[in-house]
Design a protein with these regions (language model features):
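Metallo-beta-lactamase
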Residues: 1-18, 32
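Hard-cation-handling environments
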Residues: 23-170
């Protein structure tokens, strides 16, 4: 018998408590640090964290002039399918449990994550150095694929920001 146990032996907080803690931590840390690197799974987690980070800006919980950068090719590729699924849920009046947002947030989810609204910027291996150079010493929030800290963009962020006292990793 083989059982996957990523969260084995741990009791996880309920969603609302986790979201509140995330909001409190981000609001506190954005005042203290220039760079926040949020590592996350490319599928599902990145899209949710992106939504809630933009939502915090829209609500005035964190400054809305701080750039949010998405550095995950796969994570960026899954944004539009998530938007499509949210639109489908609205059309069909189905419950949005798969997106972990309540019905009143579906329209915001669609709006905030729509790339044409420029609430965030997708960066890549080719554009990373230039964009980070432009933002050197300025506040920024970076959502990146974690690769279990063994590979992917997060390695570049470890190299660049691990020793920087004005940077924090989530």
């Amino acid at each position: 018998l083989l059982i996957e146990s990523t969260y084995g032996g741990r009791v996880r907080e309920d969603f609302d408590a986790s979201l509140k803690k995330f909001e409190q931590d981000l609001a506190r840390d954005i005042k203290k640090y220039n760079t926040i690197v949020q590592t996350c799974f490319s599928l599902d987690r990145l899209q949710k964290i992106l939504f809630y980070t933009i939502d915090m800006q829209k609500k005035g919980l964190i400054p809305n002039n701080i750039p949010i950068l998405v550095d995950s090719k796969m994570g960026a590729e899954y944004i539009n399918p998530y938007i499509d699924e949210a639109k489908k849920m609205l059309r069909e009046a189905s419950h949005p449990s798969q997106l972990a947002v309540n019905t009143k947030n579906l329209e915001n989810f669609i709006d905030y994550l729509d790339p044409k609204n420029k609430n965030y910027e997708v960066i890549s291996t080719e554009t990373r150095a230039g964009i980070l150079g432009e933002l050197d010493g300025k506040k920024k929030i970076i959502l990146t694929a974690s690769g279990m800290a063994e590979g992917g963009p997060v390695i570049e962020y470890f190299k660049r920001f691990a020793d920087d006292e004005k940077s924090v990793f989530y």
